[in-house]
Amino acid sequence: MKRLWLNAVAALSLAGALGSLTGCGFHLEGRTPLPESMKSTFVQATDMQTDFAQSLRKALLTSGARPPPDKRAASSVVYILRDDVVRRTLSVSAQNKPNEYEITYNVRFSVSSGDKELLAPQDISATRSYSFDETRLLAKEHEEAILRQAMAHDLADRVIRQLSSL
């Protein structure tokens, strides 16, 4: 009897917690739904092969968008105005060799629909640091590439969240 009562209290507490989280707009990371006006969004960039451009296209598809083949058929266009990565040395050893690097992924974008600017140019960036060991050069280059992809994914998610509020 006592055990049944404890299970009921636990279930009600869990239901209350989930209800309050849902009520405040919380949702698990994943698909951010786009409004109908953004379902046909075209991405335009000087280089569509960058980590960010690829991540943004994937994020749009995950959010339910169906990017058209050209921007004339699009309801809106995301212009990637800047997409670059800067690497700088954070610390050096006693032998004046790099011990740690910091990479910053910078993106500038805007959104328009026809002649109407929906979102003025926005600058967003992500920064990560990693240790460097020249005896493990290939592994560290791979680590940097993974960090760049992760930052591009994070930045693309931030753009999608902004698009979902338009």
What function would you assign to each model-found segment?
Residues 1-11:
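Bacterial N-terminal signal peptides that target proteins for export
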Residues 10-14, 18:
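Hydrophobic helical h-region of N-terminal Sec-dependent signal peptides
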Residues 60-64, 111-115, 134, 158-166:
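Sec/Tat-exported extracytoplasmic proteins
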Residues 138-166:
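C-terminal/domain-edge helix-coil "capping" segments
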Residues 25-28:
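Bacterial signal peptide processing site
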Residues 37-84:
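N-terminal segment of the mature soluble domain
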Residues 79-123, 129-142:
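Surface-exposed short loop/turn segments
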